[in-house]
Amino acid sequence: MAPAVDRKGYWGPTTSTLDWCEENYVVTLFVAEFWNTVSNLIMIIPPIFGAIQGIRDRLEKRYIAAYLALTVVGMGSWCFHMTLKYEMQLLDELPMIYSCCIFVYCMFECFKTKSSINYHLLFTLFLYSLTVTTIYLKVKEPIFHQVMYGMLVFTLVLRSIYIVTWVYPWLRGLGYTSLTVFLLGFLLWNIDNIFCDSLRNFRKRVPPVLGVTTQFHAWWHILTGLGSYLHILFSLYTRTLYLRYRPKVKFLFGIWPAVMFEPQRKH
């Protein structure tokens, strides 16, 4: 992470506890971190279409919530990187916790009867979210949020590995692709933090078009957005397979993956 550059922008002084490696107000005076902002589109638009498709397919509400939660994270991150205001930072970081809790619920309820509700798990995840929120609002320490978020992601990873190892081995491709994409994003996030000064110096010496490719926090958004979306597909595929539907991963326009399914034929 790096301190803000001495360039004044529309949103005024930075009040967030984090300021990332992208130089502030370089592309436009109306967006503090332009590339870190627009890269959130991958977390906003595709999940909206996923939720719409889910409503049409009459999916369980938990999966509609998962899609919409990812969209909320993207919108919050957009507002945070656009303004670098503390309130907008919370709008980014807290939904990361809430969305992951929804993902955890979906993953651990894949093998239950249709429309069942696990109130004990719901209460546990609600209590976790409430505790993290309360503590984070008081301590305002980003590392605390990162550890709490990491614990949820680690839980999802373990559950996913269990499913592709012991339950549906033929889903390894989708499960491990989701994990690999997410971990690659995490790697670039760390590179952006650790080598920020070197990256900034490099961007000063190369054409802007080339410099954009080193905005690794923006790549973190793209890769974790895609990884999270693929995780929802993996969870949804697992669930509908258990319910004896016939899910298939199809590529819309030959590019974007989506799960399409239909009820099993009755004889």
Swiss-Prot record:
Residue ranges annotated as Lumenal topological domain: 56-61, 109-118, 163-173, 237-267
Predominant place of localization: endoplasmic reticulum
Positions contributing to Zn(2+) binding: H81, H217, H221
Enzyme Commission (EC) number: 3.5.1.-, 3.5.1.23
Gene Ontology molecular function terms on file: calcium ion binding; N-acylsphingosine amidohydrolase activity; zinc ion binding
Compartments where located: Endoplasmic reticulum membrane; Golgi apparatus membrane
Keywords: Calcium, Endoplasmic reticulum, Golgi apparatus, Hydrolase, Lipid metabolism, Membrane, Metal-binding, Sphingolipid metabolism, Transmembrane, Transmembrane helix, Zinc
Enzymatic class: hydrolase
Gene: Acer3
GO BP terms, alphabetized: ceramide catabolic process; inflammatory response; myelination; phytosphingosine biosynthetic process; positive regulation of cell population proliferation; regulation of programmed cell death; sphingosine biosynthetic process
Any one GO cellular component localisation term in the record: Golgi membrane
UniProt-recorded name of the protein: Alkaline ceramidase 3
Source superkingdom: Eukaryota
Residues noted as binding Ca(2+) in the record, renumbered to the chain: D19, W20, E22, N24, E33
Annotated catalysed reactions: an N-acyl-(4R)-4-hydroxysphinganine + H2O = (4R)-hydroxysphinganine + a fatty acid; N-(5Z,8Z,11Z,14Z-eicosatetraenoyl)-sphing-4-enine + H2O = sphing-4-enine + (5Z,8Z,11Z,14Z)-eicosatetraenoate; N-(5Z,8Z,11Z,14Z-eicosatetraenoyl)-sphinganine + H2O = sphinganine + (5Z,8Z,11Z,14Z)-eicosatetraenoate; N-(5Z,8Z,11Z,14Z-eicosatetraenoyl)-(4R)-hydroxysphinganine + H2O = (4R)-hydroxysphinganine + (5Z,8Z,11Z,14Z)-eicosatetraenoate
